[in-house]
A protein has these predicted regions:
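Conserved hydrolase catalytic core segment
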Residues: 118-160
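Catalytic histidine-centered segment of alpha/beta-hydrolase-like enzymes
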Residues: 285-294, 298
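Active-site loop/oxyanion-hole signature of alpha/beta-hydrolase fold enzymes
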Residues: 27, 47, 81-123, 127
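Conserved HGGG/HGGXW glycine-rich cap/lid loop of the alpha/beta-hydrolase fold
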Residues: 40, 45-94
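Alpha/beta-hydrolase fold catalytic core
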Residues: 2-54, 74-78, 117-118, 275-278, ...
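Conserved alpha/beta-hydrolase catalytic His-Asp/Glu region
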Residues: 157-163, 181-241
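Conserved loop-alpha-helix segment in the C-terminal half of the alpha/beta-hydrolase fold
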Residues: 246-285
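Flexible "cap/lid" loop of the alpha/beta hydrolase fold
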Residues: 146-185
Length: 306
């Protein structure tokens, strides 16, 4: 596995002790949010008025990951902030049994239909990007356009040896071991050193890493374990041609790994089957683009949202 795929693998697989989150740039002020709506698998808050933009964070990450973009985005948009139950240390709800990703999609669709948000712009980071693709596949009318931030239609390609076409069946046994190891950490204290180990390489700024460590320690490892397992065995590559909503793939690069020359071809290969896809790259950034380059990320996000 080369250093580029290793970095992405860490972003998805690192939680073998407790798990990395993806975290956003924190603004000094925040838009006023509505009261929280709790559902079986997610909770939702809203801010602002205008055309709807749904923000879905990644594995073991609270909605606060988007704090740095919400104030500006809410000036012209109705911002819907999703949080997976248990990822912020809250009640896990129905997320302690299999089918979490499908449950998230079901809850999102129900919220969109009830609140007349069909055709919304949807943004998902890491695991949230996978959920966005699942939503577009299952409920195409829900999504007007989709932004995928440093995510893949099949995360397990990162574990494939050169020349091997990996399948969910091949990955499932190892994914199950990872799930069980993570779940077994529930209720056990995690040291700062362990947290640092799990967040290493996912952002470039020291203050970002500090926030990531705090969030990693707060997430319910039982939920993290199940969602990680489902991430690894979910393969949407063959579904890409049927996703008609325009897709924007936003990915990072830096002077180490991945370089711009490495990242571009890799992502284009993963999304080659999508009929309507554009690519946006942000340099001097790692997996948590919104932390490393908050201004560039906000600019790309507002351009996407319209």
């Amino acid at each position: 596995m080369n250093h580029f795929t290793l970095r992405l693998a860490v972003a998805v697989l690192a939680p073998l002790a407790i798990l990395q989150p993806n975290i956003g740039h924190c603004a000094p002020t925040a838009a006023t949010s509505t009261g929280e709506v709790r559902m079986d698998h997610i909770s939702v808050t809203e801010a602002g008025k205008g055309s709807p933009v749904i923000l879905i964070p990644g594995l073991a990450t609270p909605r606060a990951v988007w704090d740095g973009v919400v104030p500006e985005l809410a000036k012209n948009h109705r911002v819907i902030l999703v949080q997976v139950n248990g990822f912020a240390g809250d009640d896990p709800g129905a997320n302690l049994k299999p089918g979490v990703l499908d449950g998230i999609v079901t809850d999102l669709d129900a919220y969109i239909v009830k609140n007349k948000l069909t055709g919304a712009a949807v943004v998902g980071h890491s695991m949230g990007g996978l959920v966005g693709m699942m939503l577009a596949k299952a409920h195409p009318g829900d999504i007007g356009k989709l932004m995928i931030v440093d995510s893949l239609p099949f995360f397990a390609v990162l574990r494939a040896p050169p020349g091997v076409e990996v399948t969910p069946a091949m990955v499932a046994p190892q994914a199950a071991v990872a799930r069980d190891k993570i779940a077994a950490t529930y209720g056990k204290p995690m040291s700062d050193a362990d947290a640092a180990s799990q967040t290493k390489g996912l952002a470039l700024k020291p203050d970002s890493i500090t926030k990531m460590k705090a969030w990693a320690m707060k997430a319910d490892s039982r939920v993290t374990a199940e969602v990680l397992y489902e991430d690894l065995i979910t393969d949407l590559r063959s579904d890409l041609p049927s996703i008609k909503a325009p897709i924007t793939v936003l990915y990072p690069w830096n002077s180490g790994y991945p370089t711009r020359e490495m990242a571009g071809p890799f992502y284009r290969k993963q999304y080659a089957a999508a009929p309507n896809v554009t690519y946006v790259d942000i340099g001097d950034a790692a997996h948590f683009v919104m932390l490393d380059q908050p201004d560039a990320f906000l600019k790309a996000l507002t351009a996407f949202a319209g």
